[in-house]
């Protein structure tokens, strides 16, 4: 089989080649040039495992990716197109339609990419959602500000990673946003709507992650973000951006799982899909939808999930897509059987991303000997310069911790955070 794989993210986060039990399959890998963090030699050696590897500038909007995939189809006939990341779900669905390949369709995937359509659909399904509006003109923002009052929250309709998010707390913030956020992509042309606004919810943020197989929810679990919100301005200097799983005794565990089930029932997920649902939880335990994604959560959520449940969500999704392409009902049944016993985590897990502090990195601990640290990596190199956190998942390393309950887990995370930063030297 000929498999096209698309990802904006670091390819070393995925073990695509080793996930294939049958080496007769060909993988054509399409990457963002700027997500490749290894040396040229390391990347060359990595590339030898694939039929073809191509990397691009301007990855999200580079039409050469579509062009090259069509060329590959002419030469080899593409059997399967997989995307690992929110940024590729529409591109992948359009290519599937063009090439008449099975998989998720654009008319459904749009609800997971366009946040205005997402929230309109949620409201139509009676899912609690903050008030919101598309920003088609500056007047839309002024009207929303006058109706809701500050604070409000402006964000892109389709970006991820808290990029270009902005909290508006007063009229000065409003005027700054009005002067800067309605720029056209092409000089001397009108602004085309790519932003939205919603009421700012003063609440804690949680997320629920898991896997759907054959349109059936197989595994899911809730976690709490370590930061109160994902406003980029607020988290740029925080040391502990990440999340930690709730345990069974937390009074929010069951309500959050039930909320996720309602989302999954009402949103048009493809029959095999990972999911990442972000919610606000107020002090009175009211739950409101922030966003829903038909992909594995970002940061190190997949590694956290693996430490807790012993399964790799991305690997399972890869194998499900491959089985579906081969019409291998037996393999899909085996995966469902494997997941049937995973009702609760074996360990409660959490992670944090090491903040790329402004300055020049000098040194840091390369190994962690805490028994409760399931995975640790420091990726910064001596002499490397950083400008601070540029999006919510930006990092120069990470740690994944485990604990027998929620309290122990959070204590372990705090201890690891302190240890990591006490060993980092920079100037």
What are these regions (language model features)?
Residues 12-15, 35-41, 141, 361:
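Short, charged/polar "capping" segments at the starts of alpha-helices
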Residues 199-206, 210-269, 281, 293-321:
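ATP-dependent carboxylate/phosphate-activation module, predominantly the ATP-grasp catalytic core
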